[in-house]
Amino acid sequence: MPATSDSDDVAIRLLADGYVVVTGMMDAAGVDVARADLDRVLGTTPTGRNAFEGFTTQRVYALFAKTRTFDDAATHPLLLAVLDEVLRHYQLSAPVGIRIGPGEQAQILHRDDSIYPVPEPHPPLVVNTMWPLDEFTAENGATRFIPGSHAWERGRVPAADDPVETAVISPGSAMFYLGSLWHGGGANQTDAPRLGVILEYAAGWLRQQENHCLAVPREVARELPQRLQELLGYNIYPPFVGYVDGSHPREVLSAGS
């Protein structure tokens, strides 16, 4: 679907299939700038600590403390309109840059919302967006996923005969997928790394995976666009969850306390 699509149509496809690929979410210049800046950050980023992170995979945590190149992506109007429909009140949970190196093994299939002990079935809790900065191919580690698995009954896990597809997508596009969709990074069988960014959003009443109020220094957070500040956690979940000494956290941030 193109980025000019109506948000209702994107949300309907996302909820029905568990995922949707939207083209034209970032222009070529934005992709080039983001790739170059993440290459800079990755120069001092270690590889993973375990098989899930990937022993030859680098992950840029605290993303919004280290680069400004995804500020606009995180607040893309179509993305926020879809999130308004699917999650209503939401926040950034786990934004991370991921570079899968040559020789990396396939990640186990998993659900991102399984970290929350909420009885099933439940409404959508997590929506991910995956932004490729290189071509994602079946050979270089493109994400694998099982279409429709977001709607599986409680307790069902992937079987050998479940149809696994590969997210072959190009830079400038973004794949939206529910946190209940079974998925995992693919094996990189090429001699070149593949780079992308995941922006994960979660319902506003859940604990964020990354504590952005500590990960992003206050002096950096003060300079961010207001909507991005809110998404990082400087916000209130209605009616008053998240206040600071009786005040809105964004007011405290602006005051320099």
Please place each PLM-identified region on the residue numbering:
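Non-heme Fe(II)-dependent double-stranded beta-helix
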Residues: 1-17, 22-118
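Aromatic-acidic/polar surface patches that form glycan- and anion
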Residues: 27, 71-72, 122, 165-168, ...
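A short, structural micro-pattern
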Residues: 91, 123-125, 191-193
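Catalytic core of non-heme Fe(II) oxygenases with the double-stranded beta-helix
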Residues: 104-169, 203-217
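A conserved hydrophobic position in a structured secondary element of the catalytic/binding core
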Residues: 65, 75, 146, 177, ...
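Short hydrophobic/aromatic beta-strand or adjacent loop that forms the aromatic wall/cage
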Residues: 19, 126, 194-196
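Conserved double-stranded beta-helix
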Residues: 152-176, 180-181, 186-257
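A structural signal for short, well-ordered beta-strand segments
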Residues: 94-97, 129-131, 197-201
